[in-house]
């Protein structure tokens, strides 16, 4: 490796690390990976504000920033630029280069509400790039947008499948094997955004890019504020880029890994969830005129469990899905659907089956509108930070998990609809938290309270980010678009993303599409290769006819999987 820091005759500073090299000149720095220049980053980063009218106020540099200091110590070089802008009295840009990565930050001084951060936007034309394609670890709803995108196209992902995703891009260049990775890293309490976008700007004969967040006015500055950092490094491939991103979150102390003590046996499954059974029983004469959510009832689930016995199938966990409760906000069993939920749970315990309840986040059904927030689209959402809602959560969690008289004695939750997280400048929460941070606070509260009531309770949820690793027992791979015909490959890819984000967290392989026989059975029979097998229905449909032999085949796979888990757990113990 070349000398770590060199200065050329023309005043350029060159830092050479094992996976990358930067060349600092003026207010820009070239980034090289595998001896190829991937981009030239302009340190100027716009930090627009939100006006009282809830509109964006542009942030413009009034002069070029000047390189004020270059400091070297063992294994690290720090470059500091100083500038100012139309909105901020002072802006300080810092680039720290180490052996493993570089770390870039912008600190603003002044007053105002941050609308977003436009990293490397320069004077508005972005930063020049040579890479040709990018990868984002987030697939959009129903795969309308892929993980990969052309460098000439903007990339914004709003996903219901990974909430939140890892905020990291890796970029590839034609003819070069290695990749450049640029990831967003926020300190604890500073994830007050929803998105991390890649944007392209055409300028004259060229084009540039920048990276953007959406604080939407929910970060108030009265003095100084340092925006979330960008870390950069070279990577061998897409997975390597994400692994390094996750490693930084853990080793920096921002994120905590999951406690890897031996998990309760029932966490490993197999599992049965009734959601698609509810969907396919709509119109069934046995449940005349009942909607899909009205079918989350005792008669259907009792019949489902009885049908399991006929196939000699023995799940360790049963998930009662949407909508077993009277109201989403208060989570009390609907007496018109459940004569005695506790008695149902007790019967399952006697059979070795642990009952989990589907739990909808954010929905204001049954909650006081005065304690809710309104999105920019005019939709109402629960504010989970109010004392009133936290007290309501305490009551609901106790009622669901406790074995005390009058409680349900259930064994965990399937937390869903995390993507309902309220978005927009109009959202005003009691705590002032927003975006990822607001979701984190709610999920952390649920997790800690649940474990206090029942330490073995299983929390199944959807985050695909290391920040959430210690409050997620089992990550759900989520819905599969039945129009597709690659069930195994789709969910296998998601499984890789979740495992990279939260090492050691169990994977709920979730549902098959029940779209065609081949696509469905490929995934059902191979789920154990990825995670915990999960079956969503014990019947087929006209598009996907399933026979008794099919379910007996799944039963055989379940038995072999269960034996394997028991053997492995025996070896661990």
Where are the model-predicted features located?
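Active-site-adjacent "subsite" loops/lids of carbohydrate-active enzymes
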Residues: 282-299, 341-346, 353-408, 419, ...
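Carbohydrate-binding surface patches
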Residues: 573
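Glycine-rich, aromatic-flanked loop segments that form ligand/cofactor-binding clefts
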Residues: 253-279, 319, 339-378, 456-461, ...
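Well-ordered, non-membrane alpha-helical segments in soluble/globular domains
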Residues: 247-250, 292-307, 336-343, 390-395, ...
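Active-site groove signature of glycoside hydrolases
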Residues: 312-324, 393-429
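Carbohydrate-recognition beta-sandwich/jelly-roll modules
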Residues: 4-8, 13-316, 412
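The substrate-binding groove and active-site-proximal loops of carbohydrate-active enzymes
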Residues: 273-298, 323-339, 375-395, 423-439, ...
């Amino acid at each position: 490796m070349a000398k770590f820091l060199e200065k050329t005759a023309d005043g350029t500073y060159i830092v050479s690390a094992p996976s990358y090299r930067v060349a600092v000149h003026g207010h820009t720095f070239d980034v090289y990976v595998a001896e190829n220049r991937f981009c030239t980053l302009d340190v100027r980063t716009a930090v627009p504000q939100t006006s009282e009218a809830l509109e964006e106020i542009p942030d413009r540099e009034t002069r070029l920033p000047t390189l004020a200091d270059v400091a070297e110590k063992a294994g690290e070089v720090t470059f500091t630029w100083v500038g100012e802008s139309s909105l901020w009295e002072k802006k300080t840009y810092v680039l720290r280069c180490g052996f493993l990565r570089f770390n870039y930050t912008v600190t603003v001084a002044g007053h105002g509400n941050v609308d977003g951060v436009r990293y490397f936007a320069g004077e508005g034309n972005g930063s020049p790039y040579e890479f040709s394609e990018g990868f984002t670890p987030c697939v959009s709803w129903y795969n309308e947008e892929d993980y990969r995108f052309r460098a000439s196209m903007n990339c914004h992902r709003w996903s219901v499948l990974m909430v939140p995703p890892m905020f990291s891009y890796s970029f590839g260049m034609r003819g070069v094997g290695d990749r450049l990775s640029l990831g967003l890293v926020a300190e604890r309490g500073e994830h007050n955004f929803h998105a991390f976008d890649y944007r392209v700007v055409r300028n004259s004969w060229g084009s540039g890019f920048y990276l953007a967040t959406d604080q939407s006015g929910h970060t108030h500055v009265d003095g100084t504020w340092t925006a979330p950092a960008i870390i950069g490094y070279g990577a061998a491939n897409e997975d390597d880029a994400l692994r390094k991103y996750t490693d930084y979150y853990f080793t920096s102390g921002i994120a905590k890994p999951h406690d890897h003590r031996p998990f309760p046996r029932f966490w490993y499954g197999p599992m049965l969830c009734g959601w698609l059974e509810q969907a396919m029983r709509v119109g069934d004469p046995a449940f005349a005129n009942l909607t899909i959510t009205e079918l989350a009832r005792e008669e259907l689930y009792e019949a489902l469990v009885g049908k399991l016995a006929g196939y000699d199938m023995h799940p360790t966990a049963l998930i009662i899905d949407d909508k077993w409760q009277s109201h989403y906000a208060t989570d009390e069993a609907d007496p018109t659907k459940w004569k005695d939920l506790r008695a149902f749970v007790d019967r399952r315990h006697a059979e070795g089956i642990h009952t989990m309840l589907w739990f909808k986040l954010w929905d204001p059904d049954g909650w006081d509108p005065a304690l809710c927030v309104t999105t920019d689209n005019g939709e109402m959402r629960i504010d989970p930070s109010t004392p009133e809602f936290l007290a309501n959560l305490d009551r609901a969690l106790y009622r669901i998990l406790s074995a005390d008289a009058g409680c349900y004695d259930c064994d965990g939750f399937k937390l869903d609809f995390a993507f309902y997280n309220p978005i927009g400048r109009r959202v005003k929460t009691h705590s002032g938290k927003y975006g990822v941070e607001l979701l984190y606070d709610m999920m952390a509260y649920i997790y800690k309270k649940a474990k206090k009531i029942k330490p073995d309770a299983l929390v199944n949820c959807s985050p695909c980010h290391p920040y959430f690793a210690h409050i997620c027992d089992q990550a759900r791979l989520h819905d599969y678009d039945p129009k597709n015909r690659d069930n195994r490959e789709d969910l296998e890819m998601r499984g890789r993303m979740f495992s990279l984000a939260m090492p050691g967290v169990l994977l709920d392989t979730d549902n098959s599409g029940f779209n065609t026989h081949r696509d469905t059975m490929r995934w059902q029979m191979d789920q154990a290769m990825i995670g915990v097998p999960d079956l969503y229905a014990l019947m087929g449909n006209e598009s996907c006819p399933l026979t008794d032999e099919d379910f007996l085949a799944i039963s055989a796979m379940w038995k072999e999987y269960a034996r394997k888990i028991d053997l492995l757990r025996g070896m661990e113990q």
